Amino acid sequence: MGVEEMTPSLELTIIHESSLGAAGEAVRTSAIARGIRPERATRLESIIEELIRESLLREAVAGEEGVTVSVACDESSFLVTVRDHRLPITPSEARQLPSRRLAKLGFADRFRVGFEGQSGNVIYCEALLASNHDGDLDLHLRDEDADADESAALVEAADIRVMKPDDAPGLIRCLYRCYGYSYPDADLYDANAIRRALTTGLMRSIVAVLPDGEIVGHVGYAYEEATDTSPESGRLVVDPRLRGHHLTERLSAVRNEIADLLGVSGMWAKAVTNHPVSQRLAIAIGSVEVGMLLGAQPVEVTQVGQPNPDDGWRSLMLLYRAVGEIGPRTLSVPEHLAEIQSLLADRLGITRVLATELVAPERPRTAMRSHVNPAHGSVHLRVGAVGRDLEVRLGHELRSLARLRPGVIHLDLPLGDQSAAEAVLIAERHGFAWAGWIPELTADGDVLRLQRIGDHPIDFDNIVCARSEGEALRDYVVAEWQRINRRRLRGDTS
């Protein structure tokens, strides 16, 4: 049985060093009860106390202070696991930890240190019931907090450059300082996933790196799907210790230069609405509000140093910035959405001819893909082509997803499809409301994004918009959602 599969018989949470002795004694007593000799149990007690001490010394964001100690045993080994949700350990720190030296001296038979993404830092300390020492270890920590008085100088000295795959552990630590373990994209806590995204081109990132190699800022753009032509910009992370010194602007400027050089049609973004900073930065470089994703961000997502109201799930502002030349297109939209569609196209300065007649699909089958984000509580459905079976297909998808109780389901419809207007009406009958428009998202053109929100509360009172255009769009999106929601509650599927 692997150590991860062993069921704990004892679990303690330590929040202060004064409890070290009690935790160590509990481990020692449990070890002796399992047949480990008292002198070996005492050594195990010592290394566990040291591990807890090291965890408590690591930097923690609010609400993540506790260190969990669990004990499990099977027929061959006695396992103590120490877990914390503090600053992620990086591979060079563990080699310098005092606990590692104790392990090498035989205080444990097996010793493994690891950062396991959103599960946090995990140390497995094992005593074999038939001792067979083969110490094994893998990770590390080296970091000193920046003096607040020197933050401006540090920002000035930061090297703004393209991110390399080897920077992945540093990005994870920077992300932790901003969000703890609450960031909704779990892949950004996974060094291998980050490296894959960079290597395959699904993500292109810019980082701010201090002279000592520490990453203190990140911004980039990523493609939802490999064949997309307009990436999502964002994933903005700036070390809270260095905010207020225009590091975001420097990062974004380099990111935008790279997008221009690579011939990207445009970039879209999801900006938080618990504060207006991200929206203002996007608008300052030519982005335009094109929608709002209501209740798309769980309350568990918290930003260090920013307001984090917990009155319900938070909303995200959709923005789009044209980068290259965008040619004219004809879009199929229902009559009641033509006005908002025309307004947004005019604001972006791109030509869109609107066709509002309802055209029945010609193809028999709908091309649809789905992506589930369990950590975020969201589902994304994307229709590549509208078929005659859309009504049935959409109903089947919703029934299949019902057991997951998703917080929100987003549905993308291809506006270049002559039957898109008909598809919108079908989607509305299934509880989807207008959320926004993303031009040139795919090689086939623009998509309409619709939203179907679960039964969780939405925080409508704390949606902060950077300007009046955003406020007007917010009000429109809320009104559309209320219209569809009333219809759904009445059971109206006409």
List each model region and its residues.
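Short amphipathic alpha-helix that is part of the acyltransferase structural core
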Residues: 16-30, 150-189, 207-209, 232, ...
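Conserved ATP-binding N-box helix of the HATPase_c
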Residues: 38-63
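A short helix-loop-beta-strand connector motif used in the catalytic cores of GNAT acetyltransferases and
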Residues: 57-67, 195-207, 211-217, 232, ...
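Glycine-rich/acidic phosphate-handling loop/turn and adjacent ATP-lid/helix
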Residues: 76-101
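Conserved acetyl-CoA-binding loop-helix of GNAT-fold acetyltransferases
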Residues: 100, 238, 244-259, 266-269, ...
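Conserved GNAT acetyl-CoA-binding A-motif
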Residues: 120-121, 259-273, 404-414
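A conserved beta-strand-loop-helix scaffold within acyl/acetyltransferase catalytic domains
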Residues: 165-168, 172-240, 368-377, 384-389, ...
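Conserved catalytic-core motifs of GNAT/GCN5-like acyltransferases
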Residues: 270, 286-308, 433-445
